[in-house]
Amino acid sequence: MSDPRQQLIALGAVFESAALVDKLARTGQISEAPLGCMLGSLLARNPASTLDVYGGDSLNLRDGFKALASALERKPGSLQREPLRYALAMLTLERQLDKRGDMLDLIGQRLDQVEQQVQHFGLVHENVIASFASIYQDTLSTFRQRIQVHGDMRHLQVSSNAARIRALLLAGIRSARLWRQLGGSRWQMVFSRRRLLNELYPLLRG
């Protein structure tokens, strides 16, 4: 697997988180499978490939790849504006997080604790999701620049939805970190759009 392809998988996961946050904020519902995929990526240890972080199947990131393609194609009619806004905000927050070694250590310690919880309850249990959400609240949401989620207030005010949104933002920022570790940069999204799309279309076809 080429480096650009690995970068795209990680970037697609950022957009997958963004798309799920948007859907949850607007409708109050998302499927358990994509939620589990993104939460599982937070606990992935020593994966054989980037795709293995996300369950080993590009179909798990299909909505993210679609949202990323719409951003790169720049067609006003198909652009998914809110997912794009969330994704760019996650990339920005990850850069701020990178300067905070103390916070990275804390997140790592807290994720170790969640991993033990998962063994008892399962990955998408509300207690586990609440723990992921509290990590986000105690760390990333303390930055001056925060991610403002827009949607239907009836859904956003439900505590379980708020927890899932925070957990998904944490997963998206983890994927943003992986993307940058693989050599990804925001300049590529500006100056290498055609090359990225050529790599992305086969992933969209599964």
Curated annotation (Swiss-Prot):
Organism annotation: Pseudomonas aeruginosa (strain ATCC 15692 / DSM 22644 / CIP 104116 / JCM 14847 / LMG 12228 / 1C / PRS 101 / PAO1)
Keyword entries, A-Z: Cell inner membrane, Cell membrane, Cytoplasm, Membrane
PANTHER family from the UniProt entry: HIGH FREQUENCY LYSOGENIZATION PROTEIN HFLD (PTHR38100:SF1)
Compartments (UniProt record): Cytoplasm; Cell inner membrane
GO cellular component, one term: plasma membrane
Record flagged with keyword Transmembrane: no
Residue ranges the record marks as coiled coil: none
A Pfam family matched in the record: DUF489
Family named by the database record: Belongs to the HflD family.
Topology of the protein relative to the lipid bilayer: Peripheral membrane protein
Keyword field contains Cell inner membrane: yes
Protein name, as recorded: High frequency lysogenization protein HflD homolog
InterPro entries tied to this protein: HflD, HflD-like_sf
Name of the encoding gene: hflD
